[in-house]
A protein has these predicted regions:
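A transmembrane-helix-recognition feature enriched in membrane-embedded lipid enzymes
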Residues: 1-7
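Left-handed beta-helix
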Residues: 8, 13-14, 19-20, 25-34, ...
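C-terminal segments of enzyme domains that contribute to small-molecule binding surfaces
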Residues: 58-77, 81, 107-139
Length: 139
C-alpha cells in the first residue's frame, strides 16, 4: 500500500508471492512486482527491482528460487527464473534465466564459472560469511 511504502521505502505488490525467511536488508528502494515469486531463505539488498518488461496479461515478473542473494541495486526483469543458490551481484541487470548455483554479474548480467563451494549446508544462511566470499559481486 502507499502508506507502507511511505514508511518503509519498499514497494511489494500485494499479489507477489514471498517465501519464508526472506530478508530485505536496508530495504529502501526495493520493488517487487505483481507476478513475482520469491522463494525461501532469500536475501535482497537495497535498491533491488524484481520487475516486468511488458504490461501483457499473465506472468510478467521473475521467479526467484530458494537460497538466493540479490545484491544492492540489481534489476531482475521479465518472466525469467533465477534458480536455487544463485548469487546476483550489485547493480547487475538480469534479463535471462540464471541456472541453479550460478553467480550473475554485470550489465547485462553474465554468468561466472560455478564457485567451488560445498552446497550441502545451504540452510546455514545465518553464517555472516555465507554470501560474502565472491569478490566479483562487489565490483
Amino acid at each position: 500500500s502507499s502508506a507502507a511504502r511511505a514508511v518503509t521505502g519498499v514497494d511489494i505488490h500485494p499479489e507477489a508471492r514471498i517465501g519464508r525467511r526472506v530478508f530485505i536488508d536496508h530495504a529502501t528502494g526495493v520493488v517487487i512486482g505483481q507476478t513475482a515469486e520469491v522463494g525461501n531463505d532469500v536475501v535482497i539488498f537495497h535498491g533491488v527491482t524484481l520487475g516486468g518488461v511488458a504490461m501483457t496479461p499473465g506472468k510478467r515478473h521473475p521467479t526467484v528460487g530458494d537460497h538466493v542473494m540479490i545484491g544492492a541495486g540489481a534489476k531482475v526483469l521479465g518472466p525469467i527464473t533465477v534458480g536455487t543458490g544463485v548469487k546476483i551481484g550489485a547493480n547487475a541487470v538480469v534479463v535471462k534465466d540464471v541456472p541453479c548455483g550460478n553467480v550473475a554479474i554485470g550489465v547485462p548480467a553474465r554468468l561466472l564459472p560455478k564457485p567451488e563451494k560445498d552446497t550441502r549446508d545451504r540452510d546455514l544462511i545465518v553464517d555472516p560469511n555465507y554470501f560474502f566470499d565472491e569478490p566479483a559481486l562487489y565490483i
